[in-house]
């Protein structure tokens, strides 16, 4: 872009310049807290985006194994008592459950974005399941 000569313009009002002398003096005379540093905080959303990138790169299971195993055994009790599970069977169930949940949350996020929101809500999950045909 070509440079143009700046010409002086007459001010038409606006904000008056702030007086900083009093605030600077008050800041200098204020007692320090003995070098106690505030803990560092990231801006809202920064950590969330970092976690999204981290978990999208990873392939490990996100639900802890033992709590998931207890849940499977608790649900299986309703169908038949004294059932035994091979460890690979529980792992296969966990892989399938996590894959289902990740896909559901992806669809849920799309529903929230479609509604011009960034926060997912229960109604987004219900809509995603309804569109998938899982719930009438």
From Swiss-Prot:
Can be acetylated to form H3K9ac, H3K14ac, H3K18ac and H3K23ac. H3K9ac could compete with H3K9me and prevent gene silencing. H3K9acK14ac molecules are 30-fold less abundant than H3K9ac or H3K14ac. Very low level of H3K9meK14ac. H3K14 is specifically acetylated by HAG1 and deacetylated by HDA6. H3K9ac is deacetylated by HDT1. H3K9ac is restricted to euchromatin. H3K18ac, but not H3K9ac, is cell-cycle dependent and linked to replication. Reduced H4R3me2s increases H3K14ac in the FLC chromatin and activates or maintains its transcription. Ubiquitous. It is found in: Nucleus; Chromosome; Nucleus, Nucleolus. GO terms for cellular component: nucleolus; nucleosome; nucleus; plasma membrane; rDNA protrusion. Variant histone H3 which replaces conventional H3 in a wide range of nucleosomes in active genes. Constitutes the predominant form of histone H3 in non-dividing cells and is incorporated into chromatin independently of DNA synthesis. Deposited at sites of nucleosomal displacement throughout transcribed genes, suggesting that it represents an epigenetic imprint of transcriptionally active chromatin. Nucleosomes wrap and compact DNA into chromatin, limiting DNA accessibility to the cellular machineries which require DNA as a template. This is Histone H3.3. The modification N6-acetyllysine is found at residues 10, 15, 19, 24. The modification Phosphothreonine is found at residue 12. The keyword Acetylation applies. GO terms for molecular function: DNA binding; protein heterodimerization activity; structural constituent of chromatin. Keywords: Acetylation, Chromosome, DNA-binding, Methylation, Nucleosome core, Nucleus, Phosphoprotein. It comes from the Eukaryota. Gene3D superfamilies: Histone, subunit A. InterPro entries: Histone-fold, Histone_H2A/H2B/H3, Histone_H3/CENP-A. The record marks 32 as: Impaired recognition by ATXR5 and ATXR6. The record marks 28, 37 as: Not N6-acetylated. The modification N6,N6,N6-trimethyllysine is found at residues 5, 10, 28, 37. The modification Phosphoserine is found at residues 11, 29. Residues 1-43 are annotated as: Disordered. It holds the Pfam family Histone. PROSITE patterns: HISTONE_H3_1 (PS00322), HISTONE_H3_2 (PS00959). The record marks 15 as: Not N6-methylated. The modification N6-methyllysine is found at residues 5, 10, 19, 24, 28, 37.
């Amino acid at each position: 872009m070509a440079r143009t000569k700046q010409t002086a313009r007459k001010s038409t009002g606006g904000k008056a310049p702030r007086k900083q002398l009093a605030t600077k003096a008050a800041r200098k005379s204020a007692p320090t807290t003995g070098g106690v540093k505030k803990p560092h905080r990231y801006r809202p959303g920064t950590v969330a985006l970092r976690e999204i990138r981290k978990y999208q790169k990873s392939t490990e299971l996100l639900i802890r194994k033992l709590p998931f195993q207890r849940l499977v055994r608790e649900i299986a009790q309703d169908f038949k008592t004294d059932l035994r599970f091979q460890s690979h069977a529980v792992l296969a169930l966990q892989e399938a459950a996590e894959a289902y949940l990740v896909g559901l949350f992806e669809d849920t996020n799309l529903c929230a974005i479609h509604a011009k929101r960034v926060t997912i809500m229960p109604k987004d999950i219900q809509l995603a399941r309804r569109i998938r045909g899982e719930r009438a």
